[in-house]
Amino acid sequence: MGATFWIVTYLGLDIGGSKCRYEWWPTGFAGGGVAEPVHPAVDVDLAAKLADLLLGIATPAPSAAVVAMAGVDAHAKAALREQLPGHGVTFPVAIVEDTVAAAAAAGLYDEPGIVIGSGTGSFASARGADGQLARVGGRGYAFSDEGSGYDLVRKAIVAALHALDGRGRETLLTDLLTDAFDAREPQRLGGVVQRLRPREVAGRLPVLLDAYARDDWVAADVLQNGMYQLTQLGMAAWKKVAGSVQPDVRVAYGGGVLEHNEVIRDGLERTMQASFGGQLLMLSLSSSAAAEAAARLAGGWHQGDEADTEWVERVSL
């Protein structure tokens, strides 16, 4: 009888507001992919749904997994780890904030710099030369998440309604957004949108970009303000760990809004460099980077690596 070999593999999940990305480590064992997300703010019986997600992805089961999840606090992390085995998850699972995986993907694990994320939500994190970490923003779509897909579309809707009421400049956005959200008339736009999930609102970002491409000044103003807000997040995070802004800082950025929209990405780079007073070392993160970082952290955590264990169990951003 031939020998049986046990392949040690680790799984990383990056669960944002719009989708879940998963990757394996070591790379090449199995392909990564995208699944429907779960979210603490909107999903009832979160542990059962997360278990279903893990078990649906993890075939065969990994040696361990790290789940990076938006909107999870310390209580939720502890509760999920305790409840997952009762739903059939037999391998060790650690829960971290999605900002932790993004910071690791951006190299803040061991080097100073900034990471800015803009997807359905937004945030910025920074690491100083002394290892101090800070997070700014990412406090939820109702009161934070400036420069995110949701925020940009929300502000476009506000501008469209102001134009309708005669309180703002006329804009193509009024008709374009009314059609995009299947509202019967522009006056009903606000009521229709309020019934939707944040990711459904953020998904209409192409409408804003379409208006911008047609030289709509209101759309341009909304986008410019969003780039400025993201820059402010990055500056605030950096000041928390470095005291002041200066050129030559390493800045990584990612999330669906920045990854897939060149006009926003290029505008952010220009705004950041102007605000920091010179050239920055700008790095675009792929859509899989945070999930890949989570998978690597799972490996180190499971094997008892001190630095990885610190990030998984004690770093909070």
What does each model-identified segment do?
Residues 85-91, 132-140, 272-280:
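Glycine/charged-rich beta-loop-alpha catalytic/anionic-binding loops adjacent to active sites
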Residues 17, 101, 122:
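Short, glycine/acidic-enriched loop or turn micro-motifs at the edges of active sites
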Residues 110-167:
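Glycine-rich phosphate-binding loop of actin/hexokinase-like ATP-binding domains
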Residues 38, 55-95, 105-108, 250:
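Short beta-strand-loop/turn "lid" adjacent to the catalytic site in phosphate-handling enzymes
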Residues 66-73, 118-120, 249-260:
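Glycine-rich beta-strand-to-loop/alpha-helix junction loops that act as flexible
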Residues 12, 96, 117:
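Generic enzyme active-site microenvironment
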Residues 95-98, 285:
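Short, conserved loop-to-beta-strand elements that form functional interface hotspots
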Residues 2-61, 106-114, 157-317:
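ATP-binding/phosphotransfer module of carbohydrate and carboxylate kinases, centering on a glycine-rich
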